[in-house]
Amino acid sequence: MEKSFYRYLLRFRHGYEEDPVVRFANGAYDDHGFPKGSADYEELSGYLELNGDYLESMVIFDELWEQFLHET
């Protein structure tokens, strides 16, 4: 079974609150519309561009995406 990006992202919750990655993880957790089962870059980035007001910059997502690819 393919691991979703959301499940990967959750490992960063509850960290140092000033960390933008932690804020992203907490925001995605609270976002009921986040595509939780997806491991598709286009779907996730499109969603975040339109709905990810809790994400400071798409660069944060892109960096985490690269880590996700290397770790899964």
Curated annotation (Swiss-Prot):
Query: What Gene3D superfamilies does this protein's entry cite?
Result: YozE SAM-like
Transmembrane annotation, as ranges: none
Q: Which Pfam families match?
A: YozE_SAM_like (PF06855)
Query: What NCBIfam families does the entry give?
Result: PRK13672.1
Q: Which family does it belong to?
A: Belongs to the UPF0346 family.
According to UniProt, the name of this protein is UPF0346 protein GTNG_1419
Which species expresses this protein natively? Geobacillus thermodenitrificans (strain NG80-2)
Q: Top-down, what is the taxonomic lineage of the species of origin?
A: Bacteria, Bacillati, Bacillota, Bacilli, Bacillales
